[in-house]
C-alpha cells in the first residue's frame, strides 16, 4: 500500500515540477536572453520484493536549459562581424550623403570658380569680373572648409564613441565577473544544480559585450566563464574583471585609442589592427581606412589646387604691372612626435612639389640604425637615409632631421591634414589679380588668365595623375562604391545572423504552442497520478472498513 501511495506522490511532485517549468517558460517568453527549460525526470531506485525488483516511482533530477554551445558560438561570431560592418556602414553613409549633395558640393563650387575665371579671361579689364572671381574664390574656400570641418567633427565623434564603447565593455566585464561569482557559489549550495536564471543573464551580457568587441568564451570547471577579446587580451578571469581605458594615442594625441589597464605596466595601448570586430572594431576601421583616406584625399586636392594656382598666378602680372602674388594660403605639413620617444630627434617637413604629394599619412620610425617610412594608406615601407644636411625627399616632400634618435623612436607625418583648415584667399584687391603675362602689357592682356584657366583640365595636377575635377569625381565615386559595398556586406551578414538566430531559437527559444501542449500533457499526468492516489485511498478505506 505504501508503495502505491509513494509512487503516486512522486508522480504528483514530478508533474507539479513539470507544470511549473512550462508555466515559467510561458511567462518568460518575452524576456531577452531567456533559454527554454525542461524538467528532467528519472526512475527512483527499485526495491527488492518477494516477486523481484519493484519500482518506486519517479524523481526530478534537475531542470535543464535547452542550450547548444556550438550554435551559440557560431551566432556570436556572426553577430560581432555584423555589428562591425553595420557600425562602419553607418559612419560611411554619412560621408557619402555629404559628398553627394549636388547643390553645395565642392564640384559645384569649383565649377563656379572656373566659370567666373572664364568670364574674367573674356573681360580681363572688367573690375566687376575681377571682383566676382574673388567672391567665387571665397565661396570655394568656404566649401573646402565646410567639408573638412564635417570630417573633423566626425573624427571627434569617433573619439566619443570609443570612450563610450570602453565604458560599456568595462561595465559588462564587471557584471559578468560578478555573475561568475554568484553562479559558482549558488551551484555549490545547490549540490551541483546551476541557477538557470543567472546563466541566462550571463549569456545575454556576453552577447551584448560581443557586439561591441569580439570576444571568445572558455568555460572552466563549475561553469565559470573566462572571456578574452579576439586579440587575446583577457577581460574576465573567473570573478575578476579586467579593465580597458580610452586614452590619447601616443602617435597622435588628438585621437582616442584603446588601452589595456595593467596593474604593473599601467595603460598598454592595443594596436588598433587587433580590434577589428564588433561595433568598436567597426568605428576604428572606419577611422583608419575610410575617414583618414577621405580627409587626405580632400586635403591633397586642396593643396594641389592652391599650389598650382599660386605658382601660375605668380608667373603673371596684375593690373598695376606688379608681379603676381600667392592667391591662396594653404596649410603646411604636420609632423607629430610619438610621446614615448626617448631620443631628442626632431623632424620638419615642407612641400616641394604639390602635384606629387599623395593622399596618405606616413609613419616614420627608427630601427636597426635606419629610418623606415611607411605609407599608411597602402602599408608600403621603404628606407630613407638623410644626407649631410639631414634632408630626405620623397613623394613631393622634403624632410629635415635634427638631433639624435633612439631605437624605436617614431613620428607621424601628415602632409595634408592641416591644408584646408589654414586655407584662405589672400587676394582681396581685384587689381592684384595677375591676368597679364607681361609687366606692361595693359589691362586687356589675359594670357596668364588663360594659363590659370587651363589648370582646370591639366590631368597631372593632383597626385601627378588627375585633374581637379577628376580627383574630386574619383573621391565621390570611391566613397559611393565603398558605401554600397558595405551596405551589401552588412545586409548579407545580417541575414547570416538571422538564420543562426532562428536556428538557435529553435533549440533555446520558447514555442508557445509547444508549451500549451506541455501544460495539457502534464495536467493529464498530474490527474492520472491523483487518480492512483485516490485508488490507493479507496483501497485503504476498504481495508479499514473490514470487520
Curated annotation (Swiss-Prot):
Coiled coil: none annotated. One of its GO terms (biological process) is bacterial-type flagellum assembly. Keywords: Bacterial flagellum, Secreted. InterPro entries: Flag_bb_rod_N, Flg_bb/hook_C_dom, FlgK, FlgK_D2-like, FlgK_helical. Pfam families: Flg_bb_rod, Flg_bbr_C, flgK_1st_1, FlgK_D1. The keyword Secreted applies. Its main location: secreted. One of its GO terms (cellular component) is bacterial-type flagellum hook. It is found in: Secreted; Bacterial flagellum. One of its GO terms (molecular function) is structural molecule activity. Belongs to the flagella basal body rod proteins family. This is Flagellar hook-associated protein 1. It comes from Escherichia coli (strain K12). The gene is flgK.
Amino acid at each position: 500500500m505504501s508503495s502505491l501511495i509513494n509512487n503516486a506522490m512522486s508522480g504528483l511532485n514530478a508533474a507539479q515540477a513539470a507544470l511549473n517549468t512550462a508555466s515559467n517558460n510561458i511567462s518568460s517568453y518575452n524576456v531577452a536572453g531567456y533559454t527554454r527549460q525542461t524538467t528532467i525526470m528519472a526512475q527512483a531506485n527499485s526495491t527488492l520484493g518477494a516477486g523481484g525488483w519493484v519500482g518506486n516511482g519517479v524523481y526530478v533530477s534537475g531542470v535543464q536549459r535547452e542550450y547548444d554551445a556550438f550554435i551559440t558560438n557560431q551566432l556570436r561570431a556572426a553577430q560581432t562581424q555584423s555589428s562591425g560592418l553595420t557600425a562602419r556602414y553607418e559612419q560611411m553613409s554619412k560621408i557619402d550623403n555629404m559628398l553627394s549633395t549636388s547643390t553645395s558640393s565642392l564640384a559645384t563650387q569649383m565649377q563656379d570658380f572656373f566659370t567666373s575665371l572664364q568670364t574674367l579671361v573674356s573681360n580681363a579689364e572688367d573690375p566687376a569680373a575681377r571682383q566676382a572671381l574673388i567672391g567665387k574664390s571665397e565661396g570655394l574656400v568656404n566649401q573646402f572648409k565646410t567639408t573638412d570641418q564635417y570630417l573633423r567633427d566626425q573624427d571627434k565623434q569617433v573619439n566619443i564613441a570609443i570612450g563610450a564603447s570602453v565604458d560599456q565593455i568595462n561595465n559588462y566585464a564587471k557584471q559578468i565577473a560578478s555573475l561568475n561569482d554568484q553562479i559558482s557559489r549558488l551551484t555549490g549550495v545547490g549540490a551541483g544544480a546551476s541557477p538557470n536564471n543567472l546563466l541566462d543573464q550571463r549569456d545575454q551580457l556576453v552577447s551584448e559585450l560581443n557586439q561591441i568587441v569580439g570576444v571568445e568564451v572558455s568555460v572552466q570547471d563549475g561553469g565559470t566563464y573566462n572571456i578574452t577579446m579576439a586579440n587575446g587580451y583577457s577581460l574576465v578571469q573567473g570573478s575578476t574583471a579586467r579593465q580597458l581605458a580610452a586614452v590619447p594615442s601616443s602617435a597622435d594625441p588628438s585621437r582616442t585609442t584603446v588601452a589595456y589597464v595593467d596593474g604593473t605596466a599601467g595603460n598598454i595601448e592595443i594596436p588598433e589592427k587587433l580590434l577589428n570586430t564588433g561595433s568598436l572594431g567597426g568605428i576604428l576601421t572606419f577611422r583608419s581606412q575610410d575617414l583618414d583616406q577621405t580627409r587626405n584625399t580632400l586635403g591633397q586636392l586642396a593643396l594641389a589646387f592652391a599650389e598650382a594656382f599660386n605658382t601660375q598666378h605668380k608667373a603673371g602680372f596684375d593690373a598695376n604691372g606688379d608681379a603676381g602674388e600667392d592667391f591662396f594660403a594653404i596649410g603646411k605639413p604636420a609632423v607629430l612626435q610619438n610621446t614615448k620617444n626617448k631620443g631628442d630627434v626632431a623632424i620638419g617637413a615642407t612641400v616641394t612639389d604639390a602635384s606629387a604629394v599623395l593622399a596618405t599619412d606616413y609613419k616614420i620610425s627608427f630601427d636597426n640604425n635606419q629610418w623606415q617610412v611607411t605609407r599608411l594608406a597602402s602599408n608600403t615601407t621603404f628606407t630613407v637615409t638623410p644626407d649631410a644636411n639631414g634632408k630626405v625627399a620623397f613623394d613631393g616632400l622634403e624632410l629635415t632631421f635634427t638631433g639624435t634618435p633612439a631605437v624605436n623612436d617614431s613620428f607621424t607625418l601628415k602632409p595634408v591634414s592641416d591644408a584646408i583648415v589654414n586655407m584662405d584667399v589672400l587676394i582681396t584687391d581685384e587689381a592684384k589679380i595677375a591676368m597679364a603675362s607681361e609687366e606692361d602689357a595693359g589691362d586687356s592682356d589675359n594670357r596668364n588668365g588663360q594659363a590659370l584657366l587651363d589648370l582646370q583640365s591639366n590631368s597631372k595636377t593632383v597626385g601627378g595623375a588627375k585633374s581637379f575635377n577628376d580627383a574630386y569625381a574619383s573621391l565621390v565615386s570611391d566613397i559611393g562604391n565603398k558605401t554600397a559595398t558595405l551596405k551589401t556586406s552588412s545586409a548579407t551578414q545580417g541575414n547570416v545572423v538571422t538564420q543562426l538566430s532562428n536556428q538557435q531559437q529553435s533549440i533555446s527559444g520558447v514555442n508557445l504552442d509547444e508549451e500549451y501542449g506541455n501544460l495539457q500533457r502534464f495536467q493529464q499526468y498530474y490527474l492520472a497520478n491523483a487518480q492512483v492516489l485516490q485508488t490507493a485511498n479507496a483501497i485503504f478505506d476498504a481495508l479499514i472498513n473490514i470487520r
